[in-house]
Amino acid sequence: MASCLPNASPFLVMLAMCLLISTSEAEKYVVGGSEKSWKFPLSKPDSLSHWANSHRFKIGDTLIFKYEKRTESVHEGNETDYEGCNTVGKYHIVFNGGNTKVMLTKPGFRHFISGNQSHCQMGLKLAVLVISSNKTKKNLLSPSPSPSPPPSSLLSPSPSPLPNNQGVTSSSGAGFIGVMMWLMLLL
């Protein structure tokens, strides 16, 4: 029996590493699902709200805002500034580089608006709900509260669901897991 322990230990370490990697995958989301989606005019005033509601954002995920830096910017602020499209909020973080990457580091709502107030008022704003990455699968499958859509969305029908992975890139550990499984077979 004692001779089994040395062989079991590497197996358990590799199994633990595989489980850790598969549960800690972070996603990168291009806001709006495509290049230059952070621009005005939008295809529909509530298109960014619908896009955000079709995804589950977790701690560690990254939002990528792609926009024309000469004409647009991204402001991160609070809910009040988001609702009122206040572009001069006291606690705003302003991004204006054209390719802004924002890592989601804690659970809760994050609010982003255009630096151009009239663009924001026409729907160029985004609220996302970030969930803790240690939620159970049951919690991930249950509906979550959604950010307040612009008033025009109350009158328009809901669009059909977006296809999976629209605007999403995964930093998957699938290749690493395959290598680890191959190594386990060699042992």
From Swiss-Prot:
Residues 144-162 have a biased composition (Pro residues). Induction: During nodulation in legume roots after Rhizobium infection, and after release of bacteria from the infection thread. It is found in: Symbiosome, Peribacteroid membrane. It holds the Pfam family Cu_bind_like. GO terms for cellular component: peribacteroid membrane; plasma membrane. InterPro entries: Cupredoxin, Phytocyanin-like, Phytocyanin_dom. Disulfide bonds join 85-120. Residues 1-26 form the signal peptide. The keyword Membrane applies. Glycans are attached at residues 78, 116, 134. Keywords: Disulfide bond, Glycoprotein, Membrane, Nodulation, Signal. May act as a carbohydrate transporter. Belongs to the early nodulin-like (ENODL) family. This is Early nodulin-55-2. The gene is ENOD55-2.
